[in-house]
Amino acid sequence: MENLENSTDCKETVSPLNNSGSILNSTVSRHEAMGFVLVHAGAGYHSESKAKEYKHVCKRACQRAVDRLRAGGLALEAVTAALLELEDSPFTNAGTGSNLNISGEIECDASIMDGKSLNYGAVGALSGIKNPVLVARRLLSETQKGKLSAGRIPPCFLVGKGAEQWAVSHGIPACPTEKMTTKFSLSGYKRNKRKMELAEQVETKRRKQSSENDFGCLEPVGDIMVEGEENNSACLDTVGAVVVDREGNVAAAVSSGGLAMKHPGRVGQAAHYGCGCWAENARDVSLYSTAVSTSGSGEHLIRTMLARECSTAMQTENAHQALLEAMQNKFISSPFLAGEDCVLGGVIVLRCCSCGEAQRSEDIQALLDLRRTGESQHNTDCYVTVGVYAPNICICQPMFKTLHKGRTSGCAQLNHQTSGVSMEPYYREHVCGVHVCPGQ
Protein backbone atom coordinates (compact mmCIF):
# COMPACT_ATOMS: atom_id res chain seq x y z
CA MET A 1 0.00 0.00 0.00
CA GLU A 2 1.12 3.57 -0.56
CA ASN A 3 0.08 7.00 0.49
CA LEU A 4 -0.64 9.89 -1.85
CA GLU A 5 2.77 11.48 -1.53
CA ASN A 6 4.42 8.27 -2.75
CA SER A 7 1.82 7.28 -5.31
CA THR A 8 2.47 6.98 -9.03
CA ASP A 9 3.33 10.25 -10.73
CA CYS A 10 0.98 11.86 -13.21
CA LYS A 11 1.27 10.35 -16.67
CA GLU A 12 0.78 12.32 -19.84
CA THR A 13 -0.84 9.44 -21.72
CA VAL A 14 -3.80 8.96 -19.40
CA SER A 15 -7.09 9.56 -21.18
CA PRO A 16 -10.66 8.38 -20.70
CA LEU A 17 -10.50 7.08 -24.27
CA ASN A 18 -7.48 4.85 -23.84
CA ASN A 19 -7.70 3.86 -20.20
CA SER A 20 -11.05 2.27 -19.47
CA GLY A 21 -9.70 -0.43 -17.20
CA SER A 22 -9.32 -0.66 -13.47
CA ILE A 23 -6.95 1.87 -11.88
CA LEU A 24 -7.23 0.47 -8.39
CA ASN A 25 -7.97 -2.98 -7.06
CA SER A 26 -6.92 -3.54 -3.46
CA THR A 27 -8.32 -4.82 -0.21
CA VAL A 28 -8.68 -2.90 3.04
CA SER A 29 -9.93 -4.02 6.42
CA ARG A 30 -13.69 -3.69 6.68
CA HIS A 31 -13.28 -1.70 9.89
CA GLU A 32 -11.32 1.09 8.20
CA ALA A 33 -13.14 4.25 7.22
CA MET A 34 -12.40 6.18 4.05
CA GLY A 35 -13.16 9.35 2.18
CA PHE A 36 -13.24 10.48 -1.43
CA VAL A 37 -11.81 13.61 -3.05
CA LEU A 38 -12.52 14.82 -6.57
CA VAL A 39 -11.11 18.08 -7.96
CA HIS A 40 -11.15 19.83 -11.31
CA ALA A 41 -9.24 22.73 -12.82
CA GLY A 42 -12.09 23.81 -15.03
CA ALA A 43 -13.74 23.43 -18.39
CA GLY A 44 -12.26 26.22 -20.44
CA TYR A 45 -9.43 27.25 -22.74
CA HIS A 46 -6.27 25.64 -21.45
CA SER A 47 -2.78 25.76 -22.89
CA GLU A 48 -1.49 22.33 -23.88
CA SER A 49 1.99 23.58 -23.01
CA LYS A 50 0.86 23.89 -19.39
CA ALA A 51 -0.77 20.45 -19.18
CA LYS A 52 1.88 19.23 -16.73
CA GLU A 53 1.29 22.20 -14.42
CA TYR A 54 -2.49 21.72 -14.47
CA LYS A 55 -2.13 18.07 -13.54
CA HIS A 56 0.35 18.79 -10.78
CA VAL A 57 -1.83 21.43 -9.14
CA CYS A 58 -4.78 19.04 -9.20
CA LYS A 59 -2.63 16.38 -7.58
CA ARG A 60 -1.50 18.79 -4.88
CA ALA A 61 -5.10 19.83 -4.24
CA CYS A 62 -6.03 16.19 -3.73
CA GLN A 63 -3.09 15.78 -1.38
CA ARG A 64 -4.14 18.73 0.77
CA ALA A 65 -7.68 17.43 1.06
CA VAL A 66 -6.47 13.92 1.86
CA ASP A 67 -4.20 15.29 4.59
CA ARG A 68 -7.24 16.83 6.28
CA LEU A 69 -9.21 13.61 6.00
CA ARG A 70 -6.31 11.62 7.44
CA ALA A 71 -6.17 14.01 10.38
CA GLY A 72 -9.84 13.34 11.10
CA GLY A 73 -11.16 16.45 9.38
CA LEU A 74 -14.66 16.61 7.95
CA ALA A 75 -15.59 17.12 4.31
CA LEU A 76 -15.92 20.90 4.73
CA GLU A 77 -12.33 21.21 5.94
CA ALA A 78 -11.03 18.95 3.18
CA VAL A 79 -12.81 20.74 0.35
CA THR A 80 -11.52 24.09 1.64
CA ALA A 81 -7.96 22.75 1.67
CA ALA A 82 -8.30 21.57 -1.94
CA LEU A 83 -9.62 24.95 -3.10
CA LEU A 84 -6.82 26.85 -1.35
CA GLU A 85 -4.27 24.88 -3.36
CA LEU A 86 -6.13 25.54 -6.61
CA GLU A 87 -6.42 29.27 -5.85
CA ASP A 88 -2.73 29.59 -4.97
CA SER A 89 -1.61 28.16 -8.31
CA PRO A 90 -0.66 30.79 -10.91
CA PHE A 91 -1.94 28.45 -13.64
CA THR A 92 -5.61 28.42 -12.65
CA ASN A 93 -8.24 31.08 -13.18
CA ALA A 94 -8.92 31.46 -9.46
CA GLY A 95 -7.20 33.54 -6.81
CA THR A 96 -3.62 34.20 -7.89
CA GLY A 97 -3.39 34.36 -11.68
CA SER A 98 -7.07 35.12 -12.25
CA ASN A 99 -8.29 36.81 -15.40
CA LEU A 100 -8.22 40.60 -15.29
CA ASN A 101 -11.40 42.56 -15.93
CA ILE A 102 -11.66 45.36 -18.47
CA SER A 103 -10.18 47.80 -15.93
CA GLY A 104 -7.15 45.59 -15.33
CA GLU A 105 -8.33 44.47 -11.89
CA ILE A 106 -8.89 41.02 -10.41
CA GLU A 107 -12.39 40.32 -9.11
CA CYS A 108 -13.05 36.80 -7.85
CA ASP A 109 -16.14 34.73 -7.10
CA ALA A 110 -16.29 31.72 -4.78
CA SER A 111 -18.78 29.66 -2.83
CA ILE A 112 -18.83 26.65 -0.54
CA MET A 113 -21.64 24.45 0.74
CA ASP A 114 -21.75 22.01 3.64
CA GLY A 115 -24.00 19.01 3.04
CA LYS A 116 -24.39 18.29 6.74
CA SER A 117 -25.73 21.68 7.84
CA LEU A 118 -26.86 22.81 4.36
CA ASN A 119 -25.23 26.15 5.08
CA TYR A 120 -23.67 28.11 2.23
CA GLY A 121 -21.23 30.99 1.98
CA ALA A 122 -20.23 33.02 -1.07
CA VAL A 123 -18.41 36.11 -2.30
CA GLY A 124 -18.72 37.87 -5.63
CA ALA A 125 -16.59 40.43 -7.47
CA LEU A 126 -14.13 40.29 -4.57
CA SER A 127 -10.86 42.19 -4.92
CA GLY A 128 -7.91 42.44 -2.58
CA ILE A 129 -8.13 38.95 -1.04
CA LYS A 130 -5.76 36.17 -2.09
CA ASN A 131 -8.08 33.27 -1.25
CA PRO A 132 -11.76 34.05 -1.88
CA VAL A 133 -12.80 30.58 -0.69
CA LEU A 134 -11.56 31.49 2.81
CA VAL A 135 -14.02 34.36 2.93
CA ALA A 136 -16.84 32.14 1.68
CA ARG A 137 -15.94 29.54 4.30
CA ARG A 138 -15.86 32.16 7.06
CA LEU A 139 -19.27 33.48 5.99
CA LEU A 140 -20.62 29.94 6.22
CA SER A 141 -19.11 29.49 9.67
CA GLU A 142 -20.53 32.77 10.94
CA THR A 143 -24.05 31.86 9.83
CA GLN A 144 -23.82 28.72 11.96
CA LYS A 145 -23.33 30.87 15.06
CA GLY A 146 -26.83 32.29 14.83
CA LYS A 147 -28.12 35.84 14.72
CA LEU A 148 -26.05 38.96 15.24
CA SER A 149 -26.69 41.66 17.83
CA ALA A 150 -30.19 43.11 17.90
CA GLY A 151 -31.49 40.05 16.09
CA ARG A 152 -29.78 40.80 12.78
CA ILE A 153 -29.42 37.94 10.30
CA PRO A 154 -25.77 37.26 9.36
CA PRO A 155 -24.94 37.47 5.65
CA CYS A 156 -24.16 34.38 3.61
CA PHE A 157 -23.27 36.19 0.35
CA LEU A 158 -21.25 39.41 0.08
CA VAL A 159 -19.91 41.24 -2.97
CA GLY A 160 -17.40 43.90 -3.93
CA LYS A 161 -15.91 46.32 -1.44
CA GLY A 162 -18.25 45.20 1.30
CA ALA A 163 -16.99 41.63 0.99
CA GLU A 164 -13.38 42.80 1.17
CA GLN A 165 -14.05 44.94 4.25
CA TRP A 166 -15.88 42.09 5.96
CA ALA A 167 -13.00 39.69 5.22
CA VAL A 168 -10.35 42.01 6.65
CA SER A 169 -12.47 42.71 9.73
CA HIS A 170 -12.62 38.96 10.34
CA GLY A 171 -8.87 38.47 10.22
CA ILE A 172 -8.36 37.52 6.57
CA PRO A 173 -5.38 39.52 5.26
CA ALA A 174 -5.70 41.84 2.29
CA CYS A 175 -3.65 41.28 -0.86
CA PRO A 176 -3.39 43.93 -3.60
CA THR A 177 -4.20 43.02 -7.20
CA GLU A 178 -0.61 43.52 -8.35
CA LYS A 179 0.53 40.71 -6.05
CA MET A 180 -2.13 38.36 -7.45
CA THR A 181 -1.40 39.23 -11.07
CA THR A 182 0.97 36.91 -12.93
CA LYS A 183 2.93 37.50 -16.11
CA PHE A 184 0.51 35.17 -17.90
CA SER A 185 -2.63 36.98 -16.77
CA LEU A 186 -1.07 40.38 -17.49
CA SER A 187 0.08 39.40 -20.97
CA GLY A 188 -3.37 38.00 -21.69
CA TYR A 189 -4.96 41.23 -20.55
CA LYS A 190 -2.69 43.35 -22.77
CA ARG A 191 -3.34 41.08 -25.75
CA ASN A 192 -7.11 41.20 -25.28
CA LYS A 193 -7.00 44.96 -24.73
CA ARG A 194 -5.29 45.40 -28.10
CA LYS A 195 -7.92 43.19 -29.73
CA MET A 196 -10.71 45.26 -28.23
CA GLU A 197 -9.15 48.51 -29.38
CA LEU A 198 -8.67 47.12 -32.88
CA ALA A 199 -12.25 45.87 -32.99
CA GLU A 200 -13.56 49.26 -31.91
CA GLN A 201 -11.53 50.96 -34.64
CA VAL A 202 -12.86 48.56 -37.25
CA GLU A 203 -16.42 49.00 -36.02
CA THR A 204 -16.14 52.80 -36.07
CA LYS A 205 -14.81 52.69 -39.63
CA ARG A 206 -17.58 50.37 -40.78
CA ARG A 207 -20.25 52.52 -39.19
CA LYS A 208 -18.87 55.58 -40.94
CA GLN A 209 -18.81 53.78 -44.29
CA SER A 210 -22.32 52.48 -43.74
CA SER A 211 -23.62 55.95 -42.95
CA GLU A 212 -21.97 57.49 -45.99
CA ASN A 213 -22.97 54.74 -48.42
CA ASP A 214 -26.29 53.74 -46.81
CA PHE A 215 -25.29 50.09 -46.75
CA GLY A 216 -27.79 49.30 -43.99
CA CYS A 217 -27.03 46.72 -41.32
CA LEU A 218 -23.42 46.06 -40.49
CA GLU A 219 -21.66 42.72 -40.55
CA PRO A 220 -20.56 41.66 -37.05
CA VAL A 221 -16.91 42.24 -36.32
CA GLY A 222 -16.50 38.79 -34.81
CA ASP A 223 -15.63 37.37 -31.44
CA ILE A 224 -12.38 39.01 -30.44
CA MET A 225 -12.15 36.71 -27.44
CA VAL A 226 -11.88 33.56 -29.53
CA GLU A 227 -8.64 31.88 -28.61
CA GLY A 228 -5.85 32.05 -31.14
CA GLU A 229 -2.76 29.88 -31.10
CA GLU A 230 -0.87 32.60 -29.29
CA ASN A 231 -3.57 33.24 -26.72
CA ASN A 232 -4.04 30.73 -23.95
CA SER A 233 -5.50 33.06 -21.38
CA ALA A 234 -9.15 33.27 -22.37
CA CYS A 235 -10.35 30.98 -19.60
CA LEU A 236 -13.95 30.19 -18.79
CA ASP A 237 -12.84 27.75 -16.15
CA THR A 238 -14.04 27.64 -12.58
CA VAL A 239 -11.99 25.37 -10.32
CA GLY A 240 -13.75 23.20 -7.81
CA ALA A 241 -13.85 20.13 -5.61
CA VAL A 242 -16.30 17.70 -4.03
CA VAL A 243 -15.56 15.56 -0.99
CA VAL A 244 -17.17 12.87 1.14
CA ASP A 245 -15.59 12.17 4.52
CA ARG A 246 -15.46 9.00 6.60
CA GLU A 247 -18.71 9.91 8.35
CA GLY A 248 -20.52 10.23 5.04
CA ASN A 249 -20.75 14.03 5.07
CA VAL A 250 -20.41 15.73 1.70
CA ALA A 251 -19.18 19.22 0.80
CA ALA A 252 -18.55 21.16 -2.41
CA ALA A 253 -16.76 24.37 -3.34
CA VAL A 254 -15.92 26.46 -6.40
CA SER A 255 -13.73 29.48 -7.12
CA SER A 256 -13.19 31.58 -10.23
CA GLY A 257 -11.61 34.74 -11.55
CA GLY A 258 -14.42 34.99 -14.09
CA LEU A 259 -14.35 35.89 -17.75
CA ALA A 260 -11.40 37.74 -19.21
CA MET A 261 -12.18 41.42 -19.85
CA LYS A 262 -15.47 41.21 -17.95
CA HIS A 263 -17.24 44.35 -16.78
CA PRO A 264 -16.33 45.37 -13.22
CA GLY A 265 -18.88 44.02 -10.77
CA ARG A 266 -19.87 41.02 -12.88
CA VAL A 267 -20.61 37.97 -10.71
CA GLY A 268 -20.48 34.51 -12.24
CA GLN A 269 -22.02 31.20 -11.29
CA ALA A 270 -19.22 30.40 -8.85
CA ALA A 271 -20.90 32.63 -6.27
CA HIS A 272 -24.58 31.97 -6.99
CA TYR A 273 -26.64 29.63 -4.84
CA GLY A 274 -27.43 26.38 -6.63
CA CYS A 275 -25.37 27.35 -9.66
CA GLY A 276 -21.69 26.99 -8.78
CA CYS A 277 -21.83 24.18 -6.26
CA TRP A 278 -24.25 22.11 -4.25
CA ALA A 279 -23.86 19.68 -1.34
CA GLU A 280 -26.61 17.87 0.52
CA ASN A 281 -26.45 14.97 2.94
CA ALA A 282 -29.21 12.40 2.59
CA ARG A 283 -31.98 13.08 5.09
CA ASP A 284 -33.43 9.60 4.65
CA VAL A 285 -31.94 6.13 4.10
CA SER A 286 -33.79 5.95 0.78
CA LEU A 287 -31.98 9.04 -0.53
CA TYR A 288 -28.45 9.74 -1.75
CA SER A 289 -26.01 12.34 -0.50
CA THR A 290 -24.72 14.47 -3.36
CA ALA A 291 -21.99 17.05 -3.98
CA VAL A 292 -21.69 19.01 -7.23
CA SER A 293 -19.23 21.51 -8.70
CA THR A 294 -19.78 23.25 -12.05
CA SER A 295 -17.58 25.02 -14.57
CA GLY A 296 -18.17 26.87 -17.82
CA SER A 297 -19.96 30.03 -18.93
CA GLY A 298 -21.31 31.63 -15.78
CA GLU A 299 -24.33 33.20 -17.42
CA HIS A 300 -25.43 29.83 -18.85
CA LEU A 301 -24.97 28.06 -15.53
CA ILE A 302 -26.80 30.76 -13.58
CA ARG A 303 -29.85 30.69 -15.83
CA THR A 304 -30.16 26.91 -15.51
CA MET A 305 -29.10 26.47 -11.83
CA LEU A 306 -27.17 23.47 -13.08
CA ALA A 307 -25.55 22.43 -9.79
CA ARG A 308 -28.84 21.93 -8.00
CA GLU A 309 -30.46 20.35 -11.06
CA CYS A 310 -27.70 17.73 -11.22
CA SER A 311 -28.02 17.05 -7.51
CA THR A 312 -31.74 16.45 -7.88
CA ALA A 313 -31.14 14.13 -10.84
CA MET A 314 -28.80 12.01 -8.74
CA GLN A 315 -31.70 10.77 -6.60
CA THR A 316 -32.70 8.29 -9.31
CA GLU A 317 -31.26 4.79 -9.26
CA ASN A 318 -29.26 5.00 -12.51
CA ALA A 319 -26.82 7.81 -11.70
CA HIS A 320 -25.02 7.65 -15.03
CA GLN A 321 -28.13 7.95 -17.17
CA ALA A 322 -29.73 10.50 -14.87
CA LEU A 323 -26.76 12.85 -15.13
CA LEU A 324 -26.62 12.63 -18.91
CA GLU A 325 -30.34 13.31 -19.13
CA ALA A 326 -30.01 16.25 -16.75
CA MET A 327 -27.26 17.76 -18.89
CA GLN A 328 -29.35 17.28 -22.02
CA ASN A 329 -32.75 18.38 -20.70
CA LYS A 330 -31.78 20.94 -18.06
CA PHE A 331 -28.79 22.49 -19.81
CA ILE A 332 -28.20 21.76 -23.50
CA SER A 333 -31.88 21.87 -24.46
CA SER A 334 -32.98 24.16 -21.65
CA PRO A 335 -35.61 26.73 -22.70
CA PHE A 336 -33.67 29.26 -20.63
CA LEU A 337 -30.79 28.96 -23.11
CA ALA A 338 -32.87 28.72 -26.28
CA GLY A 339 -31.30 31.84 -27.78
CA GLU A 340 -27.70 30.70 -27.30
CA ASP A 341 -25.59 29.45 -30.22
CA CYS A 342 -23.23 27.47 -28.02
CA VAL A 343 -23.73 26.57 -24.39
CA LEU A 344 -20.61 25.91 -22.35
CA GLY A 345 -20.63 23.92 -19.16
CA GLY A 346 -19.10 21.11 -17.19
CA VAL A 347 -19.95 19.38 -13.95
CA ILE A 348 -18.45 16.91 -11.52
CA VAL A 349 -20.87 15.06 -9.28
CA LEU A 350 -20.29 12.80 -6.30
CA ARG A 351 -23.08 10.77 -4.82
CA CYS A 352 -22.98 8.32 -1.94
CA CYS A 353 -25.42 6.25 0.01
CA SER A 354 -25.48 4.52 3.37
CA CYS A 355 -25.96 0.88 2.52
CA GLY A 356 -27.20 -1.99 4.63
CA GLU A 357 -25.25 -4.87 6.13
CA ALA A 358 -25.97 -7.15 3.18
CA GLN A 359 -24.28 -4.75 0.77
CA ARG A 360 -21.05 -4.23 2.69
CA SER A 361 -19.15 -6.86 0.72
CA GLU A 362 -19.88 -5.09 -2.55
CA ASP A 363 -17.22 -3.08 -4.34
CA ILE A 364 -16.91 0.66 -4.02
CA GLN A 365 -17.35 1.90 -7.55
CA ALA A 366 -16.62 5.24 -9.12
CA LEU A 367 -17.52 6.29 -12.63
CA LEU A 368 -16.08 9.29 -14.36
CA ASP A 369 -17.87 10.06 -17.60
CA LEU A 370 -16.68 12.73 -19.99
CA ARG A 371 -19.34 13.34 -22.61
CA ARG A 372 -19.23 15.79 -25.46
CA THR A 373 -21.93 16.33 -27.98
CA GLY A 374 -22.86 18.70 -30.77
CA GLU A 375 -20.45 21.01 -32.52
CA SER A 376 -17.58 22.61 -30.66
CA GLN A 377 -16.92 26.16 -31.85
CA HIS A 378 -13.65 26.49 -29.96
CA ASN A 379 -10.92 24.24 -28.65
CA THR A 380 -12.19 23.31 -25.22
CA ASP A 381 -10.18 21.46 -22.61
CA CYS A 382 -11.38 19.69 -19.51
CA TYR A 383 -8.94 18.88 -16.73
CA VAL A 384 -10.22 16.53 -14.08
CA THR A 385 -8.27 14.79 -11.37
CA VAL A 386 -9.70 11.91 -9.39
CA GLY A 387 -8.26 11.35 -5.95
CA VAL A 388 -9.37 8.25 -4.08
CA TYR A 389 -8.55 8.04 -0.40
CA ALA A 390 -8.61 5.30 2.22
CA PRO A 391 -6.31 5.05 5.26
CA ASN A 392 -3.99 2.61 3.49
CA ILE A 393 -4.95 3.29 -0.10
CA CYS A 394 -4.55 6.61 -1.82
CA ILE A 395 -4.33 7.27 -5.52
CA CYS A 396 -4.31 10.43 -7.59
CA GLN A 397 -5.03 9.84 -11.25
CA PRO A 398 -5.19 12.90 -13.52
CA MET A 399 -7.08 12.82 -16.77
CA PHE A 400 -6.95 15.26 -19.64
CA LYS A 401 -9.25 15.41 -22.63
CA THR A 402 -9.27 18.03 -25.36
CA LEU A 403 -12.37 18.66 -27.42
CA HIS A 404 -11.12 19.70 -30.84
CA LYS A 405 -12.81 21.92 -33.37
CA GLY A 406 -15.55 20.32 -35.39
CA ARG A 407 -18.24 17.83 -34.51
CA THR A 408 -17.55 15.48 -31.65
CA SER A 409 -19.92 13.02 -30.09
CA GLY A 410 -19.95 9.90 -28.03
CA CYS A 411 -19.03 8.88 -24.54
CA ALA A 412 -15.76 7.93 -22.86
CA GLN A 413 -15.74 6.13 -19.55
CA LEU A 414 -13.24 5.34 -16.84
CA ASN A 415 -14.25 2.79 -14.25
CA HIS A 416 -12.45 1.56 -11.19
CA GLN A 417 -13.31 -0.83 -8.42
CA THR A 418 -11.88 -1.11 -4.93
CA SER A 419 -12.66 -4.60 -3.76
CA GLY A 420 -13.53 -5.45 -0.19
CA VAL A 421 -13.46 -1.92 1.24
CA SER A 422 -16.08 -1.41 3.93
CA MET A 423 -17.05 1.24 6.44
CA GLU A 424 -19.21 1.73 9.54
CA PRO A 425 -21.67 2.36 7.92
CA TYR A 426 -20.72 1.29 4.42
CA TYR A 427 -20.72 3.92 1.70
CA ARG A 428 -20.69 3.54 -2.05
CA GLU A 429 -19.54 6.47 -4.16
CA HIS A 430 -20.54 7.29 -7.72
CA VAL A 431 -18.66 10.08 -9.44
CA CYS A 432 -19.70 11.54 -12.75
CA GLY A 433 -18.20 14.43 -14.67
CA VAL A 434 -19.74 15.85 -17.81
CA HIS A 435 -18.46 18.51 -20.17
CA VAL A 436 -20.68 19.72 -22.98
CA CYS A 437 -20.23 22.30 -25.74
CA PRO A 438 -23.00 21.97 -28.35
CA GLY A 439 -23.46 24.16 -31.40
CA GLN A 440 -26.63 25.26 -33.13
Model-flagged regions — what are they?
Residues 2-440:
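Alpha/propeptide regions of enzymes that mature by internal proteolysis
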